Amino acid sequence: MAASQCLCCSKFLLQRQNLACFLTNPHCGSIINADGHGEVWTDWNNMSKFFQYGWRCTTNENAYSNRTLMGNWNQERYDLRNIVQPKPLPSQFGHYFETTYDTSYNNKMPLSTHRFKREPHCFPGHQPELDPPRYKCTEKSTYMNSYSKS
């Protein structure tokens, strides 16, 4: 006498077969790019998510490095650790490659690397020292609001 499977087990096996079909034939279903760390999400069925990066223990598998500039490349590029890095010294042969446009329009002085002091921040990626002064708000207490001249 053959043992019959319950409905939930047969449904699970069918979903596993669908996932195996998708992995061998990726032209079916849809592929969704995740968050730019080299991860690709496949939206095939309810079971496929458990075998993908975001549902595993770590999400850093096969991730690109920061030099690839994918995902949050703007935040990574303008991070304080990258801005404070000193620029390379000018070459002794640099004047041979200097253009008229550069001499006319790019005459900015190099910025000092010591101008950034770490300010209090509200979350790990927040960098208030990069905000221009007009966007920095000064908090006023109730006392300051009551007794200030303005």
Curated annotation (Swiss-Prot):
Highest rank taxon of the organism: Eukaryota
UniProt region (Mn 2), positions on chain: 140-150
Location of the region described as Mn 1 in the Swiss-Prot/TrEMBL record: 99-110
Keywords: Cell projection, Cilium, Cytoplasm, Cytoskeleton, Flagellum, Nucleus
Transmembrane residue ranges: none
Cross-referenced PANTHER family: CILIA- AND FLAGELLA-ASSOCIATED PROTEIN 107-RELATED, EXPRESSED SEQUENCE EH456644
Family of the protein in this entry: Belongs to the CFAP68 family.
Name assigned to this protein: Cilia- and flagella-associated protein 68
Organism: Macaca fascicularis
Gene that this polypeptide is encoded by: CFAP68
